[in-house]
């Protein structure tokens, strides 16, 4: 039976996408474990080893999709996209996914602490983490005021202070706390009128804020 492991990176940040990976290993790879237990150097080295010795898929759900769907359903979307990419490379019989209460479009089983217990999930966690970190490094050049290369979008004290100083961006998750408390309604309406955020996302954010809709 061919088993695919699935995991994500980035459910907790205030900025950027959630990234998922799906992996079928071609052979056993020494040293694989939950990406959070590895150093940056170890993750990078294992990432290259996994890429060479597995079939893998990567999926994303954007900040906009997270605001529209909520983080749970956006995570499921990213995982389904990763599995769809993997499915184009190899057919698999079962999906093992880290966590609980995740409903995917494939025959699957949730494994609590699967990123430690199941090698395929561990491999997926490493790919997802490394890819998301690289995305944050890319975004750090576009949004240079926010030190994204350091905190990777997570709600650190430094990140919060930089938001307070420079304001929010459309790539922030605008339905997340404490973002909702820091969001300017005038800025939100400006983004909506300028088509920087679409109507569906605008409505979801307004609903979260509990204020009247503008021009909808």
UniProtKB/Swiss-Prot annotation:
Domain RNase H type-2 residues, every copy: 1-188
> Per its UniProt record, what InterPro entries does this chain match?
RNase_HII (IPR022898), RNase_HII/HIII (IPR001352), RNase_HII/HIII_dom (IPR024567), RNaseH-like_sf (IPR012337), RNaseH_sf (IPR036397)
Residues that, per the record, bind a divalent metal cation:
7-8, 98
Q: Which PROSITE patterns match?
A: RNASE_H_2 (PS51975)
Q: What is its main location?
A: cytoplasm
Kindly state what the record says about how the cofactor is bound.
Answer: Manganese or magnesium. Binds 1 divalent metal ion per monomer in the absence of substrate. May bind a second metal ion after substrate binding.
Cofactor(s) needed: Mn(2+); Mg(2+)
Q: What is its EC number?
A: 3.1.26.4
Q: Which domain of life is it from?
A: Bacteria
- Give me the reactions it catalyses: Endonucleolytic cleavage to 5'-phosphomonoester
Gene Ontology molecular function, alphabetical: manganese ion binding; RNA binding; RNA-DNA hybrid ribonuclease activity
Which GO annotations describe the biological process of this protein? DNA replication, removal of RNA primer; mismatch repair
Its GO CC terms are: cytoplasm; ribonuclease H2 complex
- Any idea where this protein resides? Cytoplasm
Query: Keywords, A to Z?
Result: Cytoplasm, Endonuclease, Hydrolase, Manganese, Metal-binding, Nuclease
Against Pfam families, the record matches this protein to: RNase_HII (PF01351)
SUPFAM superfamilies (UniProt xref): Ribonuclease H-like
* Primary role: Endonuclease that specifically degrades the RNA of RNA-DNA hybrids.
| Stored NCBIfam families | PRK00015.1-3
Can you tell me which family this protein belongs to? Belongs to the RNase HII family.
**Name of this chain's protein:** Ribonuclease HII
Q: Organism, per UniProt?
A: Thermosipho melanesiensis (strain DSM 12029 / CIP 104789 / BI429)
């Amino acid at each position: 039976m061919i088993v695919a492991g699935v995991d994500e990176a980035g459910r907790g940040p205030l900025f950027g996408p959630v990234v998922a990976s799906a992996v079928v290993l071609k052979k056993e790879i020494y040293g694989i474990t939950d990406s959070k237990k590895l150093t940056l150097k170890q993750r990078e080295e294992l990432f290259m080893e996994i890429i060479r010795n597995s079939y893998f898929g990567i999926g994303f759900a954007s900040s906009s999709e997270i605001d529209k769907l909520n983080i749970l359903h956006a995570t499921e979307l990213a995982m389904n996209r990763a599995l769809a990419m993997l499915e184009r490379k190899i057919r698999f019989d079962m999906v093992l996914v880290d966590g609980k209460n995740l409903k995917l479009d494939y025959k699957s089983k949730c494994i609590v602490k699967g990123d430690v217990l199941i090698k395929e999930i561990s491999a997926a966690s490493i790919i997802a983490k490394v890819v998301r970190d690289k995305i944050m490094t890319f975004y750090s050049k576009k949004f240079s005021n926010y030190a994204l290369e350091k905190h990777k979008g997570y709600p650190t004290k430094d990140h919060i202070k930089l938001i307070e100083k420079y304001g929010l961006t459309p790539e922030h998750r605008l339905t997340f706390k404490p973002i909702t408390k820091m969001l300017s309604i005038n800025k939100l309406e400006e983004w909506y009128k300028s088509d920087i955020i679409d109507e569906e996302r605008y409505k979801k954010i307004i609903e979260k804020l509990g204020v009247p809709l503008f021009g909808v």
